[in-house]
């Protein structure tokens, strides 16, 4: 009998975590497509893999079972023919490719073994990589495309497993991701949870393909209390729909909708604040005095949405504590901005008072240590080119309950 899956906090001892080791999908990045694929540079892939291996080894050394998304995907494709059909259907963009090419591509993908199919579903495929016997005389799309263009687009953001599935209590949320470059990620996590034997019997919470919610915006502040950032990725409609779904399933009694700036540096709530202990949060200094929250609560008569209030006060009230301790990165403004950009506030808690952080954020880490938080550092010079830190790169599937 394995560990019971589920999580009701950000800081309970981490028992099972889903990661994605970066691979061939990062080698698809070029100066022409980095903006489209949401990267700020071209990572040195082998170094990024070394950094990720260090991260995975650290989590394992602290007692977490590390599940790799590519392994889960391959195993699900091997286990289920329905999984294969689901993955192929999501990857073949018939409106863009046209019916003749879509049919030929689908037939080719059906011929692949599970490992090779998993590779194509994550790394993508160019027109040059189509089988040599693909008919060119029936597809204008094939005739007119440049050989290096993608017939299946790669998923370089898969490394950020936080966004495409969220465990809340014993259930998993498969959200709708906001940007085109990431939409298919959710289809792969959906496939894994639906068809991998490890997740047999796991029930879903909140499934939407219309109102975007991303996992980086969802923080489990305490049992029954969920904060949802509303900004560049998660919409107000998505936050409200998630809240109502959690109430209906008795997974939360309070949801805090937290407006954040609609800019890349603050794309998710966890880029400006994360929990580091049961009553303690690290927060970007520039938002400490301005971050607000709308409290959404379930009542006997339905759902009420309160007026905006200071976030720390609203959070403490919902959590049932006197005060939320905030460790802010209130150093030199230039250093604070640099370290926020480098995911200094994007920590991953392994247990109450124990977090993983990028080593490069020296001053933020020092402030955490001065406040009594144990900080375990990892390298991230290459992993950080996609604008994500340790929390972004991890999907906790099981934590000890608080």
UniProtKB/Swiss-Prot annotation:
Q: What is this protein called?
A: Arginine deiminase
Q: Where is this chain primarily localised?
A: cytoplasm
- Gene field: arcA
The UniProt entry's sequence similarity note says: Belongs to the arginine deiminase family.
Which InterPro entries does its entry note? Arg_deiminase
EC number(s) on file: 3.5.3.6
The alphabetized list of GO BP terms reads: arginine catabolic process to ornithine; arginine deiminase pathway
What cellular component terms from Gene Ontology apply here? cytoplasm; plasma membrane
Describe which pathway this protein belongs to, using the record's wording.
Answer: Amino-acid degradation; L-arginine degradation via ADI pathway; carbamoyl phosphate from L-arginine: step 1/2
